[in-house]
């Protein structure tokens, strides 16, 4: 993974929120880090209130905003001290948390803050970046994933066991951060979820993210995960009637119309041609995969679904996965 940082572009942004916008967009440009609407970023800023008094604010990405295109209006300013106090509570329901976040914003027209706003607030750095990097989740989703992370990064990452995003996760991270942090700490990994990096400059937080993910990608490459020679094929064309029939069957199972598009990217064909494809497709994927075979030309389906209770859901054309199918809104054959 390569850094997209450009000094000329960066110089166009003159303040901390501007730098937050810039590096957020850099993260959003790489779909192996975040998909549309995924991930979140924040910056801590001191601003004057209407009485001319300084107040500490957390500008955090608004829920649903896309990092690739986010701009200043996409960040919600929330009172930092209140967020930190919330992390000390024993319990906080989701409706209560949303109410506390919204009622402590300093801009009523701002979007609803990310559900991970409290987590961002508890990290003692000005800039915090969070992604769902493919390489990171690929490793953590394998057997002994936690140990693999330790082998790769040593004591440079704080490791948090999986828990659903929200108040409980923020509270756990707030406690574990101070238990595990050391002079070598560069980030925090949430197993089966993603990676946090942080620093007191936007550039350093971003560069930390890129470097740590690059290490994960290098580890995967060293395991020969993608070193497969694509067999020569005379004709890779997929009959449009086959596509239509496949879409119809999947839509029937899903109980709603589904959209299916075809791509023949080399890395996808290479993966689809592996002899142990079905085994690979059912473990460690950061996105959901289903296998279909058509004569001599296997293909695979990436399904954009929800992650539910630490289970990466996979849609297959069988009756037993009907509930999973209903969670899907888009099906893409890539």
Residue ranges and their predicted role:
Residues 1-334:
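Glycine-rich flexible loops
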């Amino acid at each position: 993974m390569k850094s997209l940082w450009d000094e000329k572009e960066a110089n166009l942004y003159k303040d901390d929120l501007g730098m937050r916008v810039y590096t957020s967009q850099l993260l959003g440009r790489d779909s192996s880090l975040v998909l549309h609407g995924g991930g979140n970023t924040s910056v801590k800023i001191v601003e004057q209130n209407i009485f001319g008094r300084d107040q500490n604010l957390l500008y955090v990405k608004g829920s649903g905003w896309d990092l690739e295109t986010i701009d200043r209006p996409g960040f919600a300013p929330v009172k930092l001290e209140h967020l930190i106090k919330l992390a000390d509570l024993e319990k906080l329901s989701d409706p209560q948390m949303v109410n506390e976040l919204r009622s402590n914003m300093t801009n009523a027209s701002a979007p609803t803050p990310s559900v991970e706003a409290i987590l961002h607030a508890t990290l003692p750095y000005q800039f915090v970046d969070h992604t769902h990097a493919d390489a990171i989740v690929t490793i953590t989703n394998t057997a002994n994933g936690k140990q693999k992370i330790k082998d790769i990064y040593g004591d440079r990452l704080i490791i948090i066991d999986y828990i659903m995003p929200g108040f409980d996760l923020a509270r756990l991270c707030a406690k574990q951060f101070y238990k595990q942090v050391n002079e070598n700490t560069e980030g925090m990994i949430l197993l089966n979820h993603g990676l946090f990096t942080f620093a007191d400059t936007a550039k350093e937080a971003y560069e930390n993210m890129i470097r740590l993910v690059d290490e994960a990608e290098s580890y995967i490459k060293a395991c020969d995960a993608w070193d497969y020679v694509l067999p020569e094929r005379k004709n890779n064309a997929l009959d449009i009637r086959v596509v239509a029939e496949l879409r119809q069957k999947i839509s029937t199972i899903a109980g709603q119309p589904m959209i299916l598009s075809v791509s023949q990217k080399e890395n996808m064909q290479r993966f689809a041609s592996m002899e142990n494809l079905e085994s690979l497709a059912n473990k460690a994927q950061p996105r959901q995969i289903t296998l279909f075979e058509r004569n001599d030309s296997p293909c695979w389906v990436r399904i954009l679904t929800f992650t539910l209770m630490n289970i990466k859901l996979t849609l297959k054309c069988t009756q037993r996965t009907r509930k999973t199918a209903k969670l899907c809104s888009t099906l893409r054959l890539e």
